[in-house]
């Protein structure tokens, strides 16, 4: 049997805590201790995911988004941390450190688009490099297809919704920042990118990026980050052959798309 602490130490090798942003809260956030034989890897720890872990006999959940972020002032039965402890399930959460890590969230995302000569930028949280020349609409369609195939399918509607702001330039140098990376468009411009592909960007990010000559693709927070769960699961299977590592089937995008 493998202990929670052993898995936590391995996760720190995969995504060193030193890579995390100062405001972040990664780590072993719920520690029920002991040994586990089965682990569930997910993007978010929701009540549905806790129920799935309990149903499948998983004593540990490894997630990207922290289950505890702001200081807790009270705890009730509706809180996910409470539900974890009630079910005896520990939680390891690796957030911005996994964004920045080698083979982490952004390197997995970059690999989906065949990025070459990959470099880190935006203080390590993004990746930029060369891709085969492609138009922005073509790249957006590829994002929708490739990301949808790597995400849990919703009960209704499409799995991924992609929107883009197109300067009309062919994309040869692509920047990717998973999740809410739209505000970092100027960092992508500084790296000579033709396009920034991210999860979320607001109205003004798109206007300003396009005005400055950068195309912008927003493919969804969930969709740009969930693919890393498979990569993390594979790393844990390699490190602990005796451990059964599952990727959550009940972790879904909270949005429904028309």
Residue ranges: model-predicted function:
Residues 1-258:
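Hydrophobic structural segments
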